[in-house]
Amino acid sequence: MNGQQPSSQTSAQADRSIQPLALILLLALAAVLFFVGLGSLGLTDRDEGRNAEAGREMYETGNYISPTFNYEPRFAKPVFIYWLMSLSYHVFGVSEFAARFPSALFGVGLILLQYLFLTRCRGPVVGLFGAAMLLLNLEIIGLSRMALTDSVLIFFTTLSLYGFWLGLYGEGRERHYLWFFYIGMALATLTKGPIGFLIPMLAVGLHLWLTRSWGLFWRHGFPIPGLLLFLLLALPWYLIMLNIHGQRYTTSAQGDTIGRFFGTMEGHGGTLVFYLPVFLLGFFPWSGLLPFAWYQAYRSWRDSKRSGALPPSQTSVLDIHPSPHALEWFTAAWVLGGLVFFSLSSTRLPHYIGPLFPAAAILTASYWNRCVTDQATPGLRAAIHTITAVGCILALAFASLPPLYAKFAGKLIDEFPLAGQVTLGPGPYTVASIFLVGMGLIAYFGFSETRRPAVFWVAGGSLALVVLATTQLIFPLVHHFVIEPPQQLAEVAGVNLGPNDRLILYGQPRPSLVFYAKRKAIVVPKNEEANIKPYLTQPGRTMILLPAALRNRLPFETMDYPVLLERYGYILLANQSLIHVPEEAEQPPVRIPGH
C-alpha cells in the first residue's frame, strides 16, 4: 500500500484481497480480549443485573414477548437482547458467562465486519489498522465484556451503515448490500429502541446533504421498499407490546426515549462537552489521531466543494462512483452527527457514543496509513504528542487511585461496606507503569521517520497489557470484596426460600441480587424501612439481606432475627434457620488485603 486511495475500478479490485493469517490473528486476539474470564466477575449494577435477570426470567417463564424484571414488566429496553440471552442460557446454563456471551460474540462479529468492509474499500493494510483500532480501545473492550445492549447495537448500526455505503456506490449484485441498511436499522431498533435508526439516519442524512447525493439515494437506495422492510421487521413487536400493555407501555417508552433526551434521568447529566473527554479516554490510544484525521477529512471535503468537484446533483448512473476520499467524508459525518446528537441529549453516559467508534476507527486508520507512508502528513507530530500526553494523564490517574481511594473511602460506605478496610493492591501502579513505558516508546518511535510504523504495535500492545493487568490484578479484588459478597448471600437465600416465602433486599438497590436469588424480591431502599413491616407478619420464612451497618435501622420486629450468614460487610437475617447452605458459603472468609 502506498497510502493512495484507489482511483479506478482496477486498483480498487486489486486491493480487495483478504489476508487470511492477519484475519485469523485478529479474531483470535478479539476472542482472547472478549471471552477469557468473561464469567469470572460478578454482574455489576445496575444495568447488567437488570438485563441478565430479564433474560433469565424470559428463559424461566417462556414468555418471549414481554420482558420482565423481578417478575414485573420491563419496558426500558426492547426485546432482542433478551432473546439472545435466553438462547445463551439454553446453551450454557444460567451464569454470568452466558449473560455476557451475546455481547462478546457480537463484539467479535463487529471486528470481523470492520475488517471485511475496510479491506474491501481501502485494502488489507488499512483494513487491519481499522479493525485493530476498533478492537484495541477501552470502550469497545468494556462493552463487549458486559451484559448490556451496546455491543449488539453497535454491530447492527455498523452493519446498517456499511450496507448503505456498499449498496449505494456498488454495481450489479453489490447493490443488494443496501438491504442491510434497512435490516441493520430494524434489528438495532429492536435492540435499543429509536436510537437504532436515529444513528444511521443522522450519518446518512448528513453525508447525502454534504455530498449533494439525495437524488442518487432516492433513485438507487430503495427508499420505499426499504422503509417497508424496516417496518415489517421492527414494528410488529412494538405493536404487540402496545396491545398487551396499552397506555402504560406508551408512557414508559416515551419516558425512556424523549424523556432521556430532554431531561436528565437517574442523575446521568453532564455538560455539552461531556463526550469530548469520554472520546479521548474511551478511544485511547487512537483518540490522539482522531482530531487530526477528522480535520483532514473535513479539509478534503471543503477543498472539493470549493474546486467544484461536488456536482449540484447526481443525475445518472455514471455518477455513482464516489470521490476517492468520500469514505472519509462519510465517516467524519457519522462521528460529527452522532457526537452533536448525544451532546444535545440531557441524559449522558459514556457508552452512549459506542456506535461512533467504527467510524472513528476508519478515520484514524486511513490517517495513520498516510502517516507511515508520507512523512509530511499534516498534524503527525501533534498527534504523537496528544497520544503520549493522554497516556501520561491516564498513568497519573491510575497512580493516584490508591491515595484518593484512601482519602474518600468513607464516602463509599453505601456501595462498599468495607471501604477503608480493603486496599487496591498493586494493580493501579502496574497499570500506571505500563502506560508510562508505552508512552515513552511511542514518543521514541513516533518522532523517527524510520521507526514510526512501530507506534501502531506499541500503542496496541500497551492497551492489551493494560486490559490484562486490570482483569488479573484489579478485578479479582473488586469481585471478591465488593461485588460477590451480597450476591453470594442472595444465592443462599434463593436456595432456602419457598414459593410463598419472602426475600427483602434492603439498602442501596442492587438489581443483580434478584438474578442470584432467582426469585422475586422485595426491594426496600434506605430510609423507607416502614415498608418492611407489612411483610414481617405474613406466614412462612422471611429473609432480609442488607449491609451490616444498616442493621439498627430495621423495624423493631426484626431485632430477634439472627444473623445466619455474614460476608464482607453484608448480612443475611431470617426468622427461621437455613435449610441448606451451599458448600462455598460455609468457607471462612479470606484475609482482607491490608490487614
Regions found by a protein language model. Give the residues of each.
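Membrane-integral, polyisoprenol-dependent glycosyltransferases
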Residues: 2-379, 398-401, 568
